[in-house]
Amino acid sequence: MNELTASAGLIAFDMDSTLISIECIDEIAALAGCKQAVSQVTEAAMRGDIDFQQSLRERVALLAGVEQTRLQQLFQPIPFNPGVQQCIATLQQAGWRCVLLSGGFTWFAERLQQALQLDAVVANQLEIEAGRLTGKVVGRIVDAQVKAQQLKMLAQRWQIPISRTVAVGDGANDRDMLLAAGTGVAYCAKPALNQIADIIYDQRDLSALATRLIDAQAKA
């Protein structure tokens, strides 16, 4: 990994506890009455103590029966972290491609894409039958490796050199993505992520990050 080079590039954000202030799976678990059990597994997964794929399947299984319509409660309004809209708008105005690569769920990611006008989103799809969660995930699980692969694929699609890519995340599932990017940003992150990041960004307000990245362009 190297510091960001000149001109606009591609920035990939994690979703839960990065673009938004909540862990969606924990809040769905609250609707299902099992938040404490799910939150403990989420915390262990974000520290990197347990396998992400296995932990996700176990947690999602506990969500079986939750009505799809209740998910909307979690996004009324969307719980953005401070400065998110300003950060992304500033980068977009400077010509950047902005994407979301998440081990969370498409139900939420697609709503963020619409709200923020993101260029692409990649996330896990919850299986829903008869208006309720089944407790299963459809298709492949978006884990750390998939995030890194998607970052590279999107950079190639838009003909953006890896040196002009940035990845922003907070947990162990973001590690490979940060390592794959030209610049890895650990946002209010777990210690394991801080150890490998190029930038440790410890303030909640993300608006200053856009300025920092754009300034790096001007100086390069």
Indicate residue ranges for each PLM-predicted region.
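Alpha-helical substrate-recognition element adjacent to the catalytic core
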Residues: N2-L126
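C-terminal cap/substrate-recognition subdomain and adjoining C-terminal extension
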Residues: F75-C98, G103-A220
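Basic/polar N-terminal segments that are highly enriched at the extreme N-terminus
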Residues: M1-N2, A220
